[in-house]
Amino acid sequence: MPGNKRPKLDAQTLKALNRARPSAPPSNPEFTTNIDPTQQGDAAPSPSLPPPKPPTQINARDLKGLKYFNLINPLLEHLHECSTQRDRAGNRILHYDQYAALVLLFYFNPIIKGLRGITQASQLERLQKEPGCSRASLGSLSEAARVFDAEPLREIIGELAHKALPSTVGKEAEALRGLTAVDGSLLPALPKMAWALWQDDEHRAAKMHVHFDVFKGAPMDVTVTHGSGSENQQLRNMLLPKRLYVIDRGYAEYQLFQDIIDAGSSFIGRIKDNAAFEVLEERPITPEAKAAGVIRDAIMKRLGTEHHRNVLKQSVRIVIVATSKTDSNGQPDVLILATDRLDLAAELVALAYKYRWSVELFFRWLKCILGCRHLLATNQNGVEIQVYLGIIASLLISLWTGKKPTQRTLEMLQFYFSGWATWEELQAHIEKLKDHK
């Protein structure tokens, strides 16, 4: 793999390495390892099913805190008649807004562990009365995952993300306004999910592609494809103006860089260690940049060799950052970052790439803590609905608390929805979060 080769550094960079060693290497995991824990390419998602467990009996005592769903219902009510064109007889029992509320309940109530739990909970009078959910059989839940269009949920994500306020302010946040970390992450899929091709005919996985607003601490947009879906193409499809996209070297495509610029945005992206470039101007390294690990800052005449078509229409800058990881000779490994932002201080370019790790932490939250990797549907549309509702659940927590979602906050919400915590205790937890700076 190209990412495992030693970088071929030119004489200028080697000279800079020998002259300057970072006094305080960044502590972010991105600067100490090149392995993405959410996407280890050599490890296939396990296709085997866990041994069956006896179903958990759910009763009304297990369904507390449903008043929160009275706050959610207005968000979902416009979905009620969505995707009902086939229902000419007008006898549909389970509507889209009700299905969405049931999936959200799956995320917030730990008693409900899967489709059978959702089915059993939907039979309870209290759930039918307060959130207004209808009784749902396994068949109706399976049908809902096929017939309800997932796209309206992306619109809700956009509305909630727009309401989220920045959790980080200051000069750095102002200079890096619109900083958006972009990456993809795999969700294990079952062998019968033929649409979810990944690597070869034997493996199955879905992939979610997330745009994460770093300073809001919130996802802005998401799409779902099969495991082999092109991350670069999904980024092209989701581009917005006035964003500063920070991307890893999997997105290192010069035409994509130009597409980002053409969309009215900017980029900071890691390029491959053996990338060729022609220097136009060397920039001095300030003490602040040196402290951030920057060993070289230069404006390029072109990226790539003379044999490649120069697709970038404007000057591009290269910032080389030494990491805390060293090779066998004791020399620091380096990150070669490309950006069209000639105005940013070099230390801010390094910091922006360091912030890319925030999207990886969000993947861990979504899959391992919230439980999004436990798929409720086997078709692509159903997986999209579940992922989008997981994003909505995350955004709701952020809006309720004013902070990015954490395991402790989710636990407190689950205590409340399980009847172990009172409304007052939940409110006290939220107020404590708001008071914590």
List the predicted regions and their residue ranges.
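Single, function-defining residue in the core of a domain
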Residues: 2-117, 146-148, 156-159, 174-178, ...
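Major-groove recognition helix of helix-turn-helix-like DNA-binding domains
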Residues: 131-148
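Catalytic micro-motifs at enzyme active sites that drive phosphoryl/nucleotidyl and oxygen chemistry
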Residues: 129, 168-170, 197-199, 256
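DNA-recognition alpha helix
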Residues: 113-131
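A short, well-structured juxtamembrane/interface segment
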Residues: 162-169, 231-232
